[in-house]
């Protein structure tokens, strides 16, 4: 049976992560209150950030920036802003 958590990002019960993916206290918080679906959405945003801002994970400042963006996205409801990126519009004509 899947481990269920109340996901702070989705604001509902959802399948939790299988194991802690991030170190430290923040990692524990993510493991206990972020779902697999929310984590997958973050990974997409993280990839965009790393690529568009040319972040180097060997640089401590870049890692701090990425961690701050992750907290904002997962826990504070702030979307990731990437200069020049326009989300694909879905046509919802009925």
Swiss-Prot record:
GO terms for molecular function: iron ion binding. GO terms for cellular component: cytosol. Keywords: Iron. Could be a mediator in iron transactions between iron acquisition and iron-requiring processes, such as synthesis and/or repair of Fe-S clusters in biosynthetic enzymes. HAMAP family: Fe_traffic_YggX. Belongs to the Fe(2+)-trafficking protein family. This is Probable Fe(2+)-trafficking protein. It comes from Haemophilus ducreyi (strain 35000HP / ATCC 700724).
